[in-house]
Curated annotation (Swiss-Prot):
The entry's keywords: Glycoprotein, Glycosyltransferase, Membrane, Signal-anchor, Transferase, Transmembrane, Transmembrane helix
Protein name: Glycosyltransferase 6 domain-containing protein 1
UniProt: substrate binding residues: 85-90, 176-178, 198-201
Similarity comment: Belongs to the glycosyltransferase 6 family.
Membrane topology: Single-pass type II membrane protein
Organism: Mus musculus
Residues on Cytoplasmic side: 1-5
Enzyme class label: transferase
Transmembrane helix among keywords: yes
GO biological process: carbohydrate metabolic process
Gene: Glt6d1
EC numbers for this chain: 2.4.1.-
Annotated active site: 266 (nucleophile)
Cofactor: Mn(2+)
């Protein structure tokens, strides 16, 4: 009888110990959790839309506290990936300005892996050494659908995410090559799913947004529906989220092709974010076309997205 009591007492003591450990873990987790209100203040920018209907933040200059974000993310010991495709005639003109500016302004102070997808042997230009940055030049082959650049890009990107990128980085961005960073693109942009607002269509009426209107297309968004119009120049998030978009895009293109329907990469992107709401939106400051007049809403251009052949 005494032996049974001793065993019960030991079990009770062990259970209490586990509860104590769980309480300590929960408290520590609470202390480490970063709340939106800790770093984001939409009231500082009453001149623009700063929060979506589903309560995702829209990042404008003045709305975020980078010091709070830096304190949090440095404890997380993160690595961020940036993928860019340098193929054909675009490489010679656009790659060097992209990489030179990105090495200076993209996630400074954090480990960064640049994934450069190329269709031919490439010797990178010399850049200032940064021990936190590394470069992977990844050769891609030409296949029968290679002429469809966006299809090729998403297929190759999805393969690399599955094969190795998901094990190497915590967050991943894919950007167009004809972009030049002009100021810091920092940790305020990090989230599970990141979408870029279109610099032209953001300032237009929602009824005029150029969604896919053909009902037979996978990318179709009916009239009267839709949230924003997203630009295809930047997509980001955690690797599995970027992979999910790439896979859904490829699936949509193949289904439409089988049915004799054509659409565009950006329209598939907008359909994806209509169904799968992004957790963070980047304002037009993060992908501004320098040929546009600068409106008063845009305080600082983070990236200049140059039209092809104007850089």
């Amino acid at each position: 009888m005494k032996a049974k009591r001793r065993i019960l007492l030991q079990l009770l003591t062990f259970c209490l110990f586990l509860l104590l450990l769980a309480k300590i873990h929960f408290r520590n987790h609470q202390e480490e959790e970063l709340l939106l209100s800790d770093w984001f203040n939409p009231r500082r920018r009453l001149d623009v839309i700063t929060t979506t209907d589903w309560l995702a933040p829209i990042i404008w200059e003045g709305t975020f506290d980078r010091k709070v974000l830096e304190t949090y993310f440095r404890k997380q010991n993160i690595t961020v990936g940036l993928a860019v495709f340098a193929v054909g005639s675009l490489t010679d003109k656009y790659l060097d300005p992209f990489l030179q500016s990105a090495s200076k302004f993209f996630m400074p102070g954090y480990r960064v892996i640049f994934y450069i997808m190329v269709d031919k042997y490439l010797q990178l230009q010399e850049m200032e050494h940064n021990p936190l940055q590394s470069f992977q030049v990844l050769k891609i082959g030409k296949e029968r659908w290679w002429s469809n650049f966006d299809l090729m890009r998403m297929k190759i990107l999805s393969e690399h995410i599955r094969d190795h990128i998901r094990y190497e980085v915590d967050f991943l961005f894919s950007m167009n090559i004809n972009m030049v960073f002009q100021s810091e693109f920092g940790v305020e942009t990090l989230s599970t799913s990141v979408a870029q607002l279109h610099p032209w269509w953001y300032f237009r009426k929602r009824t005029n947004l150029p969604y896919e209107r053909k009902p037979t297309s996978v990318a179709h968004i009916p009239f009267g529906l839709g949230d924003f119009y997203y630009a295809g120049a930047i997509i980001g998030g955690v690797p599995f989220q970027v992979l999910d978009f790439a896979q859904q895009y490829l699936k949509g293109v193949f289904l439409d092709t089988e049915n004799g329907v054509n659409s565009t990469y950006e329209k598939y992107l907008n359909k994806y974010f209509f169904l799968n709401k992004p957790t963070k939106l980047l304002s037009p400051e993060y992908s501004w076309d320098p040929t546009f007049n600068l409106p008063r809403h845009v305080w600082f251009v983070k990236i200049a997205h140059h039209p092809i052949d104007t850089l």
